[in-house]
Amino acid sequence: MAIYKSLTEADLLAFSTGLIAGVDEVGRGPLVGDVVTAAVILDPNKPISGLNDSKKLSEKRREALFDEICDKALCYHVGRASPAEIDELNILHATMLAMQRAVAGLNIAPELVLVDGNRSPIFVAHNGAELTSHSIIKGDGLIASISAASIIAKVTRDREMDVLDAAYPQYGFAKHKGYPTKAHFEAIAEHGVFDQYRKSFKPVKALLGL
């Protein structure tokens, strides 16, 4: 597996003329909830305008692109790792597991997997063969399929935080999305933690005296 600091869509021809799956994650930093990943294979005959790193898009634009990706992509799948798995494996290995689940869930086998960041797990096709994969630093702003994956993962996790907010409104999940903000720390200090918290993360461990 190679690591690339810069890559354009045209460069992909050097890797593959077949189907390419882009993979990205969201939710490594929060204290609560799953780490969520997505794998997306775009349809080259149905281009999507405005794809970019999900963090650089407004919520309204992300939501609109989410719907367009779901409608136009050849296939996509969301993979995740639970707080219990994060605590057992650590956040890095849990993220790699979630990425593997995202790719394994695609109903079309890609010939190449491109992952945002500086590392990638081993991906295996349904027939047991290892898939070719490359990691691309800042790939979510360079490669359309990775951008699409970042949007699918981000919108999926944000919606899940909104659901959690409805169940536990005293924590303010709709605003901070589970990240370690001052308001979140204050809510934890007042109300404690529940089973969706990542007990291996230092602020949660400190509160629990672990």
Curated annotation (Swiss-Prot):
Manganese or magnesium. Binds 1 divalent metal ion per monomer in the absence of substrate. May bind a second metal ion after substrate binding. It holds the Pfam family RNase_HII. Keywords: Cytoplasm, Endonuclease, Hydrolase, Manganese, Metal-binding, Nuclease. Residues 18-210 form the RNase H type-2 domain. A divalent metal cation binds at D24, E25, D116. The keyword Cytoplasm applies. Its EC number is 3.1.26.4. Signal peptide: none annotated. Endonuclease that specifically degrades the RNA of RNA-DNA hybrids. Belongs to the RNase HII family. This is Ribonuclease HII. It comes from Shewanella baltica (strain OS155 / ATCC BAA-1091).
